[in-house]
Amino acid sequence: MKHSKKLLLCISFLLITIFISGCGFINKDDSKETEIKKSFNKTLSMYPIKNLEDLYDKEGYRDEEFNKNDKGTWVITSSINIQQKGEGLKTRRMVLFMNRNTRTSKGKFMITEVKEKSDIGFQTRKKEYPVKLIDNKFIPSKQIKDEKIKKEIENFKFFSQYGNFKDLKDYKDGEVSYNPNAPNYSAKYQLSNNDYNVKQIRKRYDIPTEQAPKLLLKGTGDLKGSSTGSKNIEFTFVEKKGENIYFTDSVEYTPSGDDK
């Protein structure tokens, strides 16, 4: 009888220990997810940036990589990437370097198609159009004969100009990954087609699928914040062999000199 009681106590103690440990892991994951959200919020809280030129007067996170006389450069990127069955991966991408020292912005609009050829491997076709930003408007730096592309550049909007993450704190059940040795971190969330940002992307691009995307927040560098790291947002609609549809965006604050 005494042995039975001891055995029962041991089992009870073991179950309680496992339960507490499990709660600890859950709390740890929740804590890391909260940290990742806070890290991204430093950038995402700026969205939407109606007037990009406001960034000339906004300073990002600085660390020892910055020269004390360097005001820094904002690097903004948005791209839509579509690969349908039997076709190559087609990408339309805009990147802009906003130098706070000179208060000037230059960049380029790129159209790329990558196809896999059985005889030569991958074949890449790429066209680049240099651009500048004046009075919050994109202007081609060189003459463009193709009026359709010219209009696309002039009417272009970065995701950071219309995206809104005010509800980021309410995103739940994220798949969290953190590697302090790399260092890198990420959080992934399943969205619905009713999500505000998803609607905005579909409004601006012809997304050839009704499938709702997953949102991936992906960062490198110190989780607490580092000017040498990066933060990227990715909306993945389709991801499988021979078929991919995804939209990417990033806003980074870097030491000047990277905008070559």
From Swiss-Prot:
<keyword id="KW-0449">Lipoprotein</keyword>
<dbReference type="InterPro" id="IPR038641">
    <property type="entry name" value="Csa_sf"/>
</dbReference>
<protein>
    <recommendedName>
        <fullName>Uncharacterized lipoprotein SERP2451</fullName>
    </recommendedName>
</protein>
<feature type="signal peptide">
    <location>
        <begin position="1"/>
        <end position="22"/>
    </location>
</feature>
<keyword id="KW-1003">Cell membrane</keyword>
<dbReference type="GO" id="GO:0005886">
    <property type="term" value="C:plasma membrane"/>
</dbReference>
<dbReference type="InterPro" id="IPR007595">
    <property type="entry name" value="Csa"/>
</dbReference>
<feature type="lipid moiety-binding region" description="S-diacylglycerol cysteine">
    <location>
        <position position="23"/>
    </location>
</feature>
<keyword id="KW-0472">Membrane</keyword>
<comment type="similarity">
    <text>Belongs to the staphylococcal tandem lipoprotein family.</text>
</comment>
<keyword id="KW-0732">Signal</keyword>
<feature type="lipid moiety-binding region" description="N-palmitoyl cysteine">
    <location>
        <position position="23"/>
    </location>
</feature>
<dbReference type="Pfam" id="PF04507">
    <property type="entry name" value="DUF576"/>
</dbReference>
<keyword id="KW-0564">Palmitate</keyword>
